[in-house]
Amino acid sequence: MEIGDRVQTLNTFVPITGEIVDMYKNLVTIADDDAETVDQLLSFPADDLEVIS
């Protein structure tokens, strides 16, 4: 996983998708594709995400 990759959450009822905008150790911050607010950033442990094409 690298900044700019598209990812989605694993093991969730409705997958959350977005683009990686920041990474720090095991914490990955993405810009949520379906955010309904101005602040579209969400953070997840890297193990909870998978890269998609």
What is each PLM-predicted segment?
Residues 33-53:
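Intrinsically disordered, low-complexity, charged/polar segments
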Residues 20, 31-32:
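Residue-level recognition of conserved beta-strand positions in structured domain cores
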Residues 14-23:
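Short beta-strand-centered aromatic/proline hotspots
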Residues 11-13, 34:
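A generic beta-sheet turn/junction motif
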Residues 26-29:
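Short aromatic-glycine-enriched beta-strand elements
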Residues 1-11:
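Short coil-to-beta transition motif at edge beta-strands of beta-rich domains
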Residues 6, 17, 41-43:
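Well-ordered beta-strand positions in beta-sheet-rich domains
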Residues 2, 22-23, 51:
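Generic beta-strand structural signal
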